[in-house]
Amino acid sequence: MKTLEKLSFPKLENEFLENILRQLVNQHTVIQMFFTRQPSFVFSYLIIHIEKNIDAQELQQNKWVKKVRKRYQIDVYFIYSERLHHRFSLGHPFIEFYCQPSAIIYQNKELENPLIVKRDWKKYKKRFNMFEDHFHHDHDLHLSQVQNLISEGSSNSVFTSYARLIEYDLEYLEELYSGNRSASLNLDERITNLIEYIPDIQKYFVRNSHSKYYLIDLFVKAKEASINDDEAIYKNEMYEAVGIAEQSLYRLIEERFDELKTLIKKGLFEKHDVVCQIDDKPEDVIL
């Protein structure tokens, strides 16, 4: 058992969260923690590298995770070891930037397989380009399908295909801003969540209620019409509105790629001295 009172995380500047993390380290197999403080108007990131997937899923649902996010603007993300290393191997830019050694605030030396990012931009560039190219390749395939359906005059199918393309865009925005996608949520919920990271999204999706968006409602109705083989009820000019929304999401993804690329290249993490101390616990490296 670890002596909880001897473990501290002064870099967090948050006593409430420190107390939770002490308990977390004592009760679960925590391999590492990474923390990046951001300006007050955007989320700071606390990434907790944990051994097992089942623990990561369970801990992510804890009420304190939402509380810390809402009250302190700290986004807590639990990720299990196999997934973290896999995403690192793919060149995932979120992982590359927010899991730099200078962001480590806790590391258990007794546990195997910590993530240590040692490569510089020159070594990482190829991975980054492959990751970004994969997005563009699949995006172009989705868009080509939409354009083919438009040329065929298949109105309802156009909107259901646009829905898949916009879902694809939202997945990448989630990955690039939070490190994880929210596949269990519907499109309305995913847009609402992303607004907290990217307020500009509100410009492209008009609400028709507190938690619903006009374009998403359009997609639902088009899907129902396709299933029931109903006549097309949408005018061609509606394609333009949907197309503008999709192009705007695409632009936001490109901007985020460029932002992460710049941050990684410049190495904008500060060089930290020791930010956590733990007495008489050599197995827990606090950096």
Region locations from a protein language model:
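Metal-dependent nucleotidyltransferase catalytic core
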Residues: M1-Q27, F35-G91, E96
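Long, charged low-complexity segments
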Residues: E174-L287
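Amphipathic, non-membrane alpha-helical segments in soluble helical-bundle scaffolds
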Residues: K125-H136, S155-A163, F205-I216, K235-V242
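Conserved NTP/Mg2+-binding pocket subregion across the NTase superfamily
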Residues: M1-F9, K70-E152
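Terminal, compositionally biased segments
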Residues: M1-L4, T36-S40, S44, Y106-R127, ...
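Generic structural signal for well-ordered, non-transmembrane alpha-helical segments
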Residues: H137-D140, A163-E167, G243, Q247-Y250
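Short N-terminal helix-loop-first-beta-strand/juxtamembrane motif that initiates sensory/input modules
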Residues: T29-Q32, S155-N156
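Hydrophobic alpha-helical packing segments in soluble, helical-rich domains
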Residues: S154-A183
